[in-house]
């Protein structure tokens, strides 16, 4: 019943090729100039799209995100915040080491995404690869200094970011950035060394690192 009232088009893929290539097809299917990312189990603030479209048009931005508030079970009980830089120069510098965007808050211009090569098979880092490619293609970026989404976090998120396989894929993605000249060798080596510690530590330690060291309490 709800499905019939909402003009959502589905484009099922015949074969699971991973998130990056699925997002690539999604971009190609979009019919409008501005595309919004959203995760199914997250909650956008009611005026998220209005605020983002207005700022994108006012400042002629190609890529715009914002901050997130994280919860475990109850969206009204926020446990942490992930705040990101808001100005283009800060974003460009920050993106070389960590993601300068919360992907579930992002809006971007379709033509700039295509100019940057669209999403690729990202080895768990399809968003970071696209952000760097868009910056290299001349995209003007920004982040709203506001909470745009409430995001569910839990043990599953921390488990996915650990283990030898994750570390291997992370290193391969960073190598791709290095070969493209988007990061320096020192940035590559430093990020892989840090990720090695995080990926190989016990799950509860990884959760502590993410929630207490890489997040804000307010």
Short names for language-model regions:
Residues 47-80:
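Conserved donor NDP-sugar-binding/catalytic core segment of glycosyltransferases
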Residues 1-12:
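Acidic donor-binding segment of Leloir-type glycosyltransferases
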Residues 67, 81-99:
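Short, flexible, basic/aromatic active-site loop/helix in glycosyltransferases
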Residues 139, 151, 159-184:
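Catalytic core of nucleotide-sugar-dependent glycosyltransferases
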Residues 124-130:
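Acidic donor-binding loop at a coil-to-helix junction in glycosyltransferase catalytic cores
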Residues 35:
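Short aromatic/hydrophobic "clamp" motif used to bind/position activated sugar donors
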Residues 12-30, 51:
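Glycine-rich, basic loop-to-helix element that forms the pyrophosphate-binding segment
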Residues 67, 141-148:
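Catalytic beta-strand/loop signature of glycosyltransferases that borders the donor
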């Amino acid at each position: 019943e709800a499905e019939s009232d909402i003009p959502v088009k589905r484009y099922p893929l015949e074969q699971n090729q991973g998130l990056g290539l699925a997002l690539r097809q999604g971009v190609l299917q979009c019919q409008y100039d501005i595309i919004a990312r959203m995760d199914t189990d997250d909650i956008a603030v009611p005026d998220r799209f209005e605020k983002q479209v207005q700022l994108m048009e006012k400042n002629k931005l190609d890529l715009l995100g914002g901050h997130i508030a994280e919860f475990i079970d109850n969206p009204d009980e926020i446990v942490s915040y992930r705040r990101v830089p808001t100005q283009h120069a800060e974003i460009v510098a920050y993106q070389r080491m960590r993601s300068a965007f919360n992907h579930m808050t992002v809006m971007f211009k379709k033509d700039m995404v295509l100019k940057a090569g669209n999403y690729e098979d990202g080895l768990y880092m399809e968003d970071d690869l696209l952000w760097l490619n868009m910056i290299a293609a001349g995209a003007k970026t920004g982040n709203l200094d506001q909470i745009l989404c409430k995001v569910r976090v839990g043990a599953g998120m921390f488990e996915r970011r650990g283990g030898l396989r994750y570390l291997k894929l992370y290193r391969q993605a960073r190598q791709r950035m290095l070969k493209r000249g988007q990061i320096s060798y020192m940035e590559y080596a430093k990020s892989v060394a840090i990720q090695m510690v995080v990926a190989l530590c016990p799950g509860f330690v990884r959760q502590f690192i993410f929630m207490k060291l890489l997040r804000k309490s307010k």
